[in-house]
A protein has these predicted regions:
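A compositional/structural signature for long, glycine/proline-rich flexible linkers
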Residues: 1-393
Length: 393
């Protein structure tokens, strides 16, 4: 007595169409199912699906009232069903021929019931509202459709004490559509230097394998905002998933309202300059000099232009540098080298601010992004030196 899988989940939450707040990645799609555990005690969920074709895929369970994650499972850790393989571990052309089963259960589920469960995400039994998110990165690019070429996983509710299946539980309204706890963002500071800091990630339905560095930018008329760093390696195939520095990395630009308008991801940036750096130039989409700026960027290896429409999106920009699934052996991991900036600092209270650990260039060296704002004419001049982008004064 269950609806079709696509009807069980909420509609596709797309990073690319300005319907999602909280600076989503444009190349990610999300789906959410939320139910009231308070009204349905002892009820867990069994998800059965086929592996979607994408760069990255995971499930995260949240306490919907706090928007904090309580458990998650990543693609490579999902044990496949009998006679299936996991295409994120073993290369195959046919992802969708392979099935998986995931259990989402309260912490008080009896051991006897757990004995036969392979993939378990649990939540504390004092959670009132349980939200399950499924995320896919680059599904459209890899499979041609946002679902990764397969149906959504089917949701079956069951009683964890008896094992008996029960009717589908009504999907409640998830807070991601309503009241996100967004920190105050102040874009009024107009310094030319653009330091990057690690985002405080316990907010707004964080994706646990992801880490973010951000810089707040006020882009004035006639200016370009620039930043550069040495990027991590990303995999070209499944066989490189275990050895690449990160599974995926991207740069996204979001507005003061926290919508995302521009993204570029690793595969779209095949080149670095002779020192191993990538350089980003954020230019006003309405600038008369845009063709000249683009020509100058194209003439320099590893330099990429991102356009920003100041007229429509305002002059406040949040630049986000995202790393997904950071390799434990990567020596330049932002997760290991940087401390998150305290929320108080976003509001201006700098008492808990430690620059050596909280400014990317100081904590991560050349691998930490650092930027500078120049006039368009300065950038276009023959004497422009890319090394000046990372100066702190």
């Amino acid at each position: 007595n269950n609806p079709e899988p696509k009807e069980q989940w909420g509609k596709t939450l797309r990073g690319d169409n300005q319907t999602l707040l909280a600076f989503p990645d444009i190349y990610a799609d999300y789906w959410e199912y939320t139910y009231s555990y308070k009204d349905n005690p002892n009820i867990g969920l069994r998800l059965t699906g086929k592996f979607p074709k994408s760069r990255f895929f995971n499930f995260t369970v949240y306490n919907d009232e706090t928007q904090i994650d309580v458990s998650s499972i990543e693609d490579v850790n999902i044990q496949p069903d009998d006679s299936s393989i996991n295409p994120y571990v073993k290369e195959t052309d046919d992802y969708g021929a392979n099935g998986y089963t995931i259990y989402i259960i309260p912490a008080n589920t009896p051991a006897s019931a757990r004995a036969s469960m392979k993939n378990v995400c649990e939540f504390p039994e004092d959670v009132n509202m349980v939200s399950i998110f499924m995320r896919l990165y680059l599904a459209k690019q890899y499979s041609g459709d946002e679902y990764g070429g397969v149906d959504m996983p089917a949701i079956q509710a069951f009683d964890v004490t008896t094992g008996e299946e029960v009717d589908f539980l009504k999907r409640e309204v998830c807070n991601i559509h309503e009241s996100l706890n967004l920190p105050p963002m102040d874009f009024s500071a107009d310094l030319p230097q653009l330091p990057f800091m690690r985002a405080p990630l316990s907010l707004m339905y964080p994706n646990s394998p992801a880490e973010y560095l951000f810089a707040r930018i006020k882009l004035n008329e006639g200016e370009v905002a620039t930043f550069r760093f040495i990027p991590p390696t990303a995999p070209k195939s499944v066989s490189e998933y275990a050895t690449a520095d990160v599974r995926y990395w991207s740069i996204c630009l979001g507005s003061a309202e926290t919508y995302s308008y521009a993204s570029i991801y690793d595969e779209e940036m095949p080149k670095v300059d002779k020192e191993g750096f990538v350089t980003f130039i954020i230019a006003d989409a309405n600038s008369a000099k845009l063709p000249d700026l683009q020509a100058k960027a194209e003439a320099n290896d590893g330099t990429y232009i991102l356009t920003w429409n100041r007229k429509e999106q305002g002059d406040g920009i949040l630049a986000l540098y995202r790393n997904m699934v950071i390799n434990e052996n990567y020596p330049h991991s932002m997760r290991k080298l940087m401390e998150s900036v305290p929320l108080a600092a976003a509001g201006g209270d700098m008492s808990g601010f430690n620059p050596m650990k909280m400014i990317a260039m100081l904590a991560m060296g050349n691998w930490g992004p650092q930027g500078y704002k120049f006039s368009e004419d300065d950038f276009l001049s023959d004497s422009f030196n890319y090394a000046n982008i990372r100066r702190m004064k």
